[in-house]
A protein has these predicted regions:
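Glycine-rich, aromatic-bearing surface loops/beta-hairpins
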Residues: 111-157
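Short, surface-exposed beta-edge/turn micro-motifs
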Residues: 17-21, 104, 110-115, 120
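Surface-exposed, polar/charged interaction patches used for macromolecular assembly or partner binding
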Residues: 4, 19, 91-100, 155
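Terminal, regulation- and interaction-focused segments at domain boundaries
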Residues: 10-28
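Short, surface-exposed beta-strand/loop "edge" segments at domain boundaries and coil↔beta transitions
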Residues: 27-34, 72-75, 87, 122-128
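Surface-exposed, low-hydrophobicity interaction/linker segments
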Residues: 57-99
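Short, flexible, solvent-exposed loop/turn segments with mixed acidic/basic and small polar residues
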Residues: 6-15, 99-110
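Short, well-structured hydrophobic secondary-structure segments
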Residues: 29-74
């Protein structure tokens, strides 16, 4: 007599959010960038808990800055695309491991420096003034609920 397993199929969340991709015009330290951003906006970005991704060989941290705009009632998050710290947990002994000491949240967009998200379902990134001499124009990028970055943004919100 064999037991047949039955699975309850939950309603799938097929929603999508838009994030903004931020590319720096020139290399600049984070503290200078956010000092400049805070100077020209009414709301102020503060460093909050880093996003931590645990791997088999490395733990990667990504910096995160957050601000709340009282007029639009939106919470904005800047997340670094490239890991700022990688802590090695154990020695890699495989020749072709897919894990390295540097990780990108958006692997296909390694030229992106920051990912901008907000709490509103309809992202309006033009409300954030960015220093023109440091940052290129924000590019909107759709994220489906199946992507790892979507899950991370939802978890840390």
């Amino acid at each position: 007599l064999s037991i047949k397993k039955q699975y309850l199929k939950l309603e799938e969340d097929l929603s999508e959010i838009n994030v903004g991709l931020i590319r720096l015009a020139k290399p600049i330290p984070e503290h200078e960038l956010f000092f400049s951003i805070n100077e020209i906006n009414t709301f102020k970005f503060k460093r909050v808990e880093d996003i931590l991704i645990k791997g088999e060989y490395f733990d990667h941290s990504f910096s995160r800055y957050q601000a709340y705009d009282k007029s639009s009632k939106n919470c904005y998050n800047f997340i670094s695309n490239k890991s700022i710290v990688s802590i090695q947990k154990k020695e890699q002994n495989q020749l072709f491991s897919d894990e390295s000491n540097i990780k990108f949240l958006l692997n296909l967009h390694q030229d992106v420096d920051y990912i901008l998200s907000n709490s509103d379902m309809f992202a309006e990134f033009s409300l954030i003034l960015l220093p023109e001499n440091f940052v290129f124009q924000t590019q909107e990028y759709p994220l489906s609920s199946e992507e790892e970055l979507y899950q991370l943004i939802q978890y840390y919100e």
